[in-house]
Curated annotation (Swiss-Prot):
GO biological process terms on file: division septum assembly
Its biological purpose: Necessary for normal cell division and for the maintenance of normal septation.
Classification via Pfam families: MMR_HSR1
Keyword field contains Nucleotide-binding: yes
Organism per entry: Pectobacterium carotovorum subsp. carotovorum (strain PC1)
Gene: engB
NCBIfam families recorded: GTPase_YsxC (TIGR03598)
Family the UniProt entry places it in: Belongs to the TRAFAC class TrmE-Era-EngA-EngB-Septin-like GTPase superfamily. EngB GTPase family.
Repeat found in the keyword field: no
Record key words, sorted: Cell cycle, Cell division, GTP-binding, Magnesium, Metal-binding, Nucleotide-binding, Septation
Name of the featured protein: Probable GTP-binding protein EngB
Length: 211
């Protein structure tokens, strides 16, 4: 049975430069990843109905740390460093990418990945790499096509259908939805997916403990 979580109760736990400085690797985490201007912080703020939970910046590439938020005991959302922003110094970019890759490959509690892309510019190389990595380790993916309010209804549907077809060759557990923080479009789909992931995994953990 799918439990409904109170995302408005989500609270900030810690910011860390790398995996070694994070909280204990137990429980369940779902990570939010995307290019530096994809609207990750806005999506997290909209999901939790908290204006300042995740800091939004007019300057893409400011989210340099892995940020952890607790929904309830043992259930966390993770805001990962934005990737692919050209104006960040190369050395800093490499450092972020290393922290990002290390988290994605070594974090045992990571159980789902939300990949955010601007609906007008979806499936850039790094976006596709992120999806491929998730599929390789059998991690379910929710793709959110953000800033959907920037397109008229017909164009929005066309982009949604195009991306849904484009991810089929990945052969993974991938769902694609349009999303707008401004218009609250797709927020219900995001909540449903998170509820489903967290409920399924919490139930599985309880069964393991009972054995």
């Amino acid at each position: 049975m799918t439990q409904q979580y109170n995302y408005h109760m989500t609270r900030f736990i810690i910011s860390a430069p790398d995996i070694r400085h994070l909280a204990t690797d137990s429980g369940i985490e779902v990570a939010f990843a995307g290019r530096s201007n994809a609207g990750k912080s806005s999506a997290l703020n909209t999901l939790t109905n908290q204006k300042n939970l995740a800091r939004t910046s007019k300057t893409p590439g400011r989210t340099q740390l892995i940020n952890l938020f607790e929904v309830t005991d043992g259930v966390r959302l993770v805001d990962l460093p934005g990737y692919g922003y050209a104006e960040v110094p190369e050395q800093m970019k490499i450092k972020w990418q290393r922290a990002l890759g290390e988290y994605l490959q070594k974090r045992n509690s990571l159980k789902g990945l939300v990949v955010l892309m601007d609906i007008r510019h979806p499936l850039k190389d790094l976006d596709q790499q992120m999806i491929q990595w998730a599929v390789d380790v059998e991690l379910p993916v929710l793709v959110l096509l953000t800033k959907a309010d920037k397109l008229a209804s017909g164009a929005r549907k066309a982009q949604l259908n195009m991306v849904r077809e484009a991810v089929l060759p990945f052969m993974g557990d991938i769902q694609v939805e349009a999303f707008s923080s401004l218009k609250k479009l797709g927020v219900d789909k995001l909540r449903q997916k998170l509820d489903n992931w967290f409920s399924t995994l919490e139930h599985a953990e309880e069964e393991q403990e009972a054995e």
